[in-house]
């Protein structure tokens, strides 16, 4: 009799067996065989619910990114069973796009065996199951973040981009659901931090969540405005994926703290004395700024002073809805002609280069002012990680000014 019971039990699908009777190795082997993966899953999620949506689910967070995950060829979906009989190998309607990496099996006794794909899409039971699974997956991911940080950071490296796309792609509709799962690199702590961790450590006088977007954390940390933010004792999120800034712009704020791109608009971090000095310098050098703007021939909307640049002579900022990093991302897309940020050239009134500009202008040397303007603009582009329009002309300009 004992042997017969063993045999019968082994015929029960793994997702229907009590969790305390299944070893971790059994779950891992099932996952690898069923979903043709060579790595163990990062997390196994089991769920049995009764009531409005009655089902049993066995889900897995993969330990590595499928080779085709970020391509059009990737098919999301969970294997859907009705009373132990598979009715669909990949039911996409059970998963929202932002959780499309989840693999697994869902078995329900409430579904008909001969239900068609078209009927299934309209099935209210399926919608209830999807909503329930969405909450379960979110809670399990957050539990992994809290209780197993190392595993969560592996998950984030593999699939964090998809979570960010989920916020951006749905126009921020799911920011409350997904916001506390987000991680970004901290300039202060030199590691990934959550938005909750960032907000908890904000000094009382800090009003915004500051971020910089670009290709490389080292370069971003050296930006003039990054140095300014850090010098005030504030942390800075360094965003290096193309979706990052779009995601944060769509969220707008987190825990009532607005997201602020350090290279878009006025940061408002100058002291009262610096403000007064800047206003005086703006008035005093109005003609010089007009001349520089004219020399740059439409490349910048405005030229102004920025007294907070410390040792940097120049920087670029952007006005309006498109930042300089967004311009870079959008220009890589098809049909992106004419996509451009509205740039502002900001000069450090306390730098020796500014003194040289003023001297050339006072002496009426318009040729030198034009060369300095072009040089400073190109330098500001390089600092911002943007390509200069004519590298040959830039090299000749530098050599000419050195002679």
What are these regions (language model features)?
Residues 1-403:
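Conserved GHKL (Bergerat-fold) ATPase module
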